[in-house]
From Swiss-Prot:
Domain of life, per lineage: Bacteria
Compartments, as annotated in UniProt: Cytoplasm
Main localization of the protein described in the UniProt heading: cytoplasm
Protein purpose: Catalyzes the ferrous insertion into protoporphyrin IX.
Annotated source species: Pseudomonas aeruginosa (strain ATCC 15692 / DSM 22644 / CIP 104116 / JCM 14847 / LMG 12228 / 1C / PRS 101 / PAO1)
BP GO terms, sorted: heme biosynthetic process
Residues reported to bind Fe cation: 189, 292
Family: Belongs to the ferrochelatase family.
SUPFAM superfamilies: Chelatase
Top-level class of the enzyme under EC nomenclature: lyase
Gene: hemH
InterPro entries tied to this protein: Ferrochelatase, Ferrochelatase_C, Ferrochelatase_N
Catalytic reaction equation(s): heme b + 2 H(+) = protoporphyrin IX + Fe(2+)
Listed name of the protein: Ferrochelatase
Length: 340
C-alpha cells in the first residue's frame, strides 16, 4: 500500500537570536507578496527600510523567550510532530515551516526521494488568511511543479469551527478557567483590513461587527475576522462562559495601515478601566506558543496591563502538544483533507 505522509505546516522562526539570522528570516517573511501585498519595487523598498532597525529589536525580543533547545515554536512543533506519529498509521509525519527551517522545499524533496507519492498537508492555522494558509499552499505547489515531483497532495482546510478543535481548546484551557479571574480575553493575530477587502467583495460586509451572526456563508469562507469571531463564540458557548466575562481582540499589527479591530493593546487598557484586575489571555489563532504569545502577550502585554492598574495577566498556553489537540488534528487530517 502506498504510504501517505502527513506534513505539518507552520509559519517559521529564525535559526537563532543573532541579528543576522533574524534579518534573514524577516526578509524572507516580509518579502512574501501574500504578507506585504505591494508591488515588488515598493515592497522591496519598504522591507529594506524595516530591516534597518527591526532585526535588532526582534532579536532582543526573541532572546527574551528563546529556550535552551531553540525556538519555542520549532521545539513545540517538533513535540507535536512526535506526538502525532502514533495517531497517523498511514506513513511518516513530517514538519515544515513556510519561512526558515525546516523548509517546505527540503522536506518535500526528501519525501519524494523516499518514494512517498501521497502527502496530506496540515496547515496549522485554524482561521483562513492569504498570509498564512494560501502562501503555504502556494509554496507547496511551486516546489512540486519546479521539481516535477508528481506528488498527490490533499490539504486540511481551515478548521475554526470544527467541533473536535473547539473541544480540544476547551479541554486545554479549562484548568485556567477554574482559577480566580475577572475576564478572559481571546487575542487573535491581526490582519490589515485590505487583505480581507480584496477577498470579500460585498461592500456591506461589516469589519467592525461584534459577532458573526449576520455574516453570509460566502463572506465567512473568506473573512479571517469573521472566522475568529465564530471560533470565539463557539468556544465561549462550549466552555460555558458568561456574557460580559470574555471578549475578543487582535494583536501584532505592523505599520500604519488600518488593521482589524479592536486592537489588543487598546483592549488591555480598556479592561483595566472597566475594573478588571485579574485577566486571562488565550491566543486561539496560534496552535503553538511563539514570540507573539510568549513575548508580545506574556511579557509586554502583562507589563502594560499591570502598569495600567491591573493586578495580574496570565497567558494561557496554546494547544502545543496537548493530547486533546493531537487527537483532534489526527482526526481532522484524515477526515477533512481535500485535493490541493
Amino acid at each position: 500500500m502506498t504510504e501517505n505522509a502527513l506534513l505539518l505546516l507552520n509559519l517559521g522562526s529564525p535559526d537563532s537570536t543573532r541579528v543576522e539570522d533574524v534579518r534573514r528570516y524577516l526578509d524572507q517573511f516580509l518579502m512574501d507578496p501574500y504578507v506585504v501585498d505591494l508591488p515588488w519595487p515598493l515592497r522591496r523598498l519598504l522591507v529594506s527600510l524595516i530591516l534597518i532597525k527591526r532585526p535588532a529589536e526582534s532579536a532582543h525580543a526573541y532572546s527574551s523567550i528563546w529556550w535552551d533547545e531553540g525556538s519555542p515554536l520549532i521545539v513545540l512543533s517538533r513535540r507535536l510532530q512526535e506526538a502525532m506519529k502514533p495517531h497517523w498509521p498511514h506513513g511518516p509525519v513530517e514538519l515544515a515551516m513556510r519561512y526558515g527551517q525546516p523548509a517546505i522545499e527540503k522536506v518535500l524533496l526528501d519525501l519524494a526521494r523516499r518514494g512517498i507519492r501521497r502527502v496530506t498537508l496540515a496547515p496549522l492555522y485554524p482561521q483562513f488568511a492569504d498570509s498564512t494558509t494560501t502562501t503555504a499552499e502556494q509554496e507547496v505547489r511551486r516546489v512540486i511543479a519546479a521539481h516535477r515531483l508528481g506528488l498527490e497532495v490533499s490539504t486540511l482546510p481551515p478548521f475554526y469551527d470544527q467541533p473536535v478543535y473547539l473541544d480540544a481548546l476547551v479541554e486545554s484551557v479549562r484548568p485556567y478557567l477554574q482559577q480566580p479571574h475577572d475576564h478572559l480575553l481571546l487575542s487573535f493575530h491581526g490582519l490589515p483590513e485590505r487583505h480581507i477587502r480584496k477577498l470579500v467583495k460585498d461592500p456591506a460586509h461589516d469589519l467592525l461587527a461584534e459577532n458573526s451572526r449576520n455574516v453570509s456563508p460566502e463572506a465567512l469562507a473568506l473573512c479571517y475576522r469573521s472566522q475568529c469571531l465564530r471560533t470565539a463564540e463557539a468556544f465561549a458557548e462550549r466552555a460555558g462562559l458568561e456574557q460580559g466575562r470574555w471578549s475578543v481582540s487582535f494583536q501584532s499589527r505592523l505599520g500604519r495601515a488600518k488593521w482589524i479591530e479592536p486592537y489588543t493593546d487598546a483592549k488591555l487598557d480598556e479592561l483595566v478601566q472597566r475594573g478588571v484586575k485579574r485577566l486571562l489571555v488565550m491566543c486561539p489563532a496560534f496552535v503553538a506558543d511563539c514570540i507573539e504569545t510568549l513575548e508580545e502577550i506574556g511579557m509586554r502585554g502583562r507589563e502594560q496591563f499591570i502598569s495600567a492598574g491591573g493586578e495580574d495577566l496570565v497567558l494561557i498556553p496554546c494547544l502545543n502538544d496537548h493530547p486533546a489537540w493531537v487527537g483532534a488534528l489526527a482526526e481532522m487530517s484524515g477526515r477533512l483533507a481535500r485535493p490541493l
